[in-house]
Each structure stands twice: as C-alpha cells, then as structure tokens.
Amino acid sequence: MSSKGGSSGGMWSVFIHGHDGSNKGSKTYTSGGGGMWGGGSSSGVKSGVNGGVKSGTGKI
C-alpha cells in the first residue's frame, strides 16, 4: 500500500471502514482523515486529526 501519491481519499475510506466498528471515533477519522497517521488508537485519534491533517497533507 505505497499509494502516498494522490489516492488519499481512498485510504481514508479503508481506515474509516476499519475503525468504524473497532473504535468509537469513526466520525472523527472521517472528518480528520489523520487517524492513519496518528496511529489509530484512542489517544491517536485526536493527535491524528489535529496533527495528522496538517502533517499528513504536507507529506502528501
């Protein structure tokens, strides 16, 4: 899965589906889309959404 080029939206979908039933922050992942960079854990949700969006967008 080395698609760091432009299919970021697709990666969000995968993560959203993966965490949709696992964690309660499914909506947060969807809105921020930084869950994948944050780590995916409960503590990584907020840090992923807040920091992952900016750092993630920059890396993309």
Swiss-Prot record:
<feature type="compositionally biased region" description="Gly residues">
    <location>
        <begin position="49"/>
        <end position="60"/>
    </location>
</feature>
<dbReference type="Pfam" id="PF07020">
    <property type="entry name" value="Orthopox_C10L"/>
</dbReference>
<dbReference type="InterPro" id="IPR009748">
    <property type="entry name" value="Orthopox_C10L"/>
</dbReference>
<feature type="compositionally biased region" description="Gly residues">
    <location>
        <begin position="31"/>
        <end position="42"/>
    </location>
</feature>
<comment type="similarity">
    <text>Belongs to the orthopoxvirus OPG024 family.</text>
</comment>
<protein>
    <recommendedName>
        <fullName>OPG024 protein</fullName>
    </recommendedName>
</protein>
<feature type="region of interest" description="Disordered">
    <location>
        <begin position="1"/>
        <end position="60"/>
    </location>
</feature>
<keyword id="KW-0244">Early protein</keyword>
